[in-house]
Structures are given as C-alpha cells and as structure tokens.
Design a protein with these regions (language model features):
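Iron-sulfur (Fe-S) cluster-binding modules
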Residues: 1-13, 149-157
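Short cysteine-rich clusters marking metal-coordination/redox-active sites
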Residues: 17, 27, 61, 73, ...
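Iron-sulfur cluster-binding cysteine motifs and their immediate structural context
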Residues: 22-42, 67-85, 101-118, 136-156
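Short linker/helix segments within small regulatory modules
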Residues: 50-52, 85-90, 115-124, 131-135
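Short, solvent-exposed interaction modules
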Residues: 59, 64, 107-110, 119-131
Length: 157
C-alpha cells in the first residue's frame, strides 16, 4: 500500500455549536463564490426535529489515515489527491468525473463527501481544510462560538 502522510482535521464541539450554519456558508463562498449548501465541503446532518426547531450538526471529512475515498477513486492522484506537504486529502474539480466512488467508499454512516453541480458538471466536494488559505480553515475562523478547531496532523490520535 502507498505510504500516505497524515493530515490534520476539524474537531467539532457540540456543546458550543448553535447550528447557525455560518461554517457551511463560509466554506461554499470561499471555495466557489456562492452561498449554496451543496457547494460546501461540510455535510450538514439533520439530527432531529423538536417542535419548530431542526437540530443539525456539521460533518467534516476526517482526513482518514487510510483514506478509502482516495483508494476507491478511479482517477487516484488526479481527481482525489493527497498534498505531499500537509497530507490534506482534496479533490480536483477539474479532474473529478462525479462517479461517486469516493462517496460510496467513505467509511462513515453519513458520508463526509457531497456530489454537487459545479459549472454544469457533477463533482465530488469535501473538506480540504482550506489547504491553500494562509489563515487556515475559514469555517474555524467564522465560528463565533469556537465550536470548530483545526487539530494539526502532529496531534492526531
């Protein structure tokens, strides 16, 4: 098996989260310039309905040590890539065919990858930890309750 570098990940603190979806919106705007939940690298999971309120939580790609999405991709190293510098697993929208193999391979009951229509092309969208952003993940920055934290790769369990 290929030697895969470790990556950091986003940690969510449920006791601090209000479910406001600022993280979701900021992600979509930063990456795609549009306010659209389907364009976010964060998957929004509806937990339950309580009277008039919908309880929701954000789900982030956990940047798995053994990224099943990466190995399932027929265009491995082209459509799903691993950054050699920081280990981040990310998707090349230009190369992705939208086949959904990565979504199916995600080991979580609620997959951390979306399929979205970007410029009339179905592609996979997932958290890439804003890998090219100097200030780190935009979702962490916009969360006023500090419910999101970037756990560096060196602190990964």
């Amino acid at each position: 098996m290929k030697n895969i570098p470790k990556s950091g990940y986003i940690k969510w603190e449920p006791d601090e989260c209000l479910g406001c979806s600022r993280c979701l919106t900021a992600c979509a705007v930063y990456h795609h310039g549009a306010v659209s939940p389907s364009l976010s690298g964060i998957v929004w999971h509806d937990e339950m309905q309580l009277q008039k309120f919908q309880l929701r939580r954000p789900l982030f790609c956990q940047q798995c040590d053994v990224p099943e999405c990466y190995f399932a991709c027929p265009l491995m190293d082209e459509a799903i890539c691993i950054d050699s510098a920081n280990g981040t697993r990310h998707i090349s929208i230009k190369e992705c065919t939208g086949c959904g193999s990565c979504v199916e391979a995600c080991p979580f009951d609620e997959p951390r990858i979306n399929l979205a229509d970007i410029d009339r092309k179905m592609v996979a969208v997932k958290c890439d930890l804003c890998r090219n952003r100097e200030d780190g993940p935009v979702c962490v920055q916009v969360c006023s309750r500090h419910a999101l934290t970037l756990v560096p790769k060196g602190e990964r369990l």
